[in-house]
C-alpha cells in the first residue's frame, strides 16, 4: 500500500484552519479554491470536482472535533483502497496541517501525491489570506 504524508506550517489560527477543514461541503470556497472547483453533499459523502476535471466521491468516515481530524475514503474510480485524513495541530503562533493518504494500487502514488501537493498550495494560500 502506498502511503503519502504531507505537512505544512500555516500562519493561521488553528481554530480558523480547522473550521475550514471541517466544513466538508465547502472545500471549493473555504479550503482549497482553485484546486477544488465544486463540492456537493450526498448523504454521508461529498462529490468533489477538481480543477483538472477529475471527480471523486468521498465518504466522510469521521469528524473528530477534539483532535481536529477529518477522515474520508474515496469510493469507486481507479483506486481499490483510499483512506485520507487531514489534521490540524497548534504550533507556535499558527498551526500545522498534516494530510495523509493510504492508497492502492501503488502505481497511483505519483499522480495522487502531485494532486495533493497542488491542494496543499491552494490550502496555504486560502488559509493564510485573512
Language-model regions: role of each:
Residues 1, 51-53, 79:
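Glycine-centered tight beta-turn/hairpin loop motif at sheet-sheet or coil-to-beta transitions
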Residues 1-40:
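Hydrophobic ligand-binding cavity/cleft-lining segments
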Residues 8, 56-62, 83-90:
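Hydrophobic/aromatic beta-strand elements that line small-molecule binding cavities or substrate pockets
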Residues 10, 51, 90-92:
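A generic beta-sheet turn/junction motif
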Residues 17-21, 27, 46, 60, ...:
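Hydrophobic pocket/interface hotspot
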Residues 34, 125-130:
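Short, highly charged C-terminal tails/helix-capping segments
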Residues 64-68:
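Short, conserved beta-turn/loop elements at beta-strand boundaries and strand-helix junctions
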Residues 74-126:
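Beta-strand/loop substructures that line and gate deep hydrophobic ligand-binding cavities in soluble
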Amino acid at each position: 500500500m502506498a502511503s503519502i504524508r504531507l505537512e505544512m506550517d500555516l500562519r493561521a489560527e488553528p481554530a480558523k484552519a480547522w473550521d475550514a477543514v471541517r466544513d466538508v461541503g465547502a472545500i471549493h470556497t473555504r479550503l482549497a479554491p482553485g484546486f477544488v472547483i465544486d463540492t456537493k453533499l450526498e448523504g454521508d459523502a461529498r462529490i468533489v470536482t477538481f480543477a483538472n476535471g477529475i471527480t471523486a466521491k468521498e465518504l466522510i468516515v469521521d469528524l473528530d472535533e477534539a483532535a481536529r481530524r477529518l477522515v474520508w475514503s474515496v469510493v469507486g474510480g481507479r483506486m481499490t483502497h483510499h483512506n485520507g485524513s487531514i489534521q490540524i495541530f497548534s504550533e507556535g503562533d499558527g498551526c500545522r496541517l498534516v494530510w495523509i493518504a493510504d492508497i492502492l494500487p501503488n502505481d497511483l502514488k505519483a499522480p495522487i501525491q502531485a494532486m495533493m501537493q497542488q491542494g496543499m498550495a491552494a490550502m496555504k494560500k486560502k488559509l493564510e489570506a485573512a
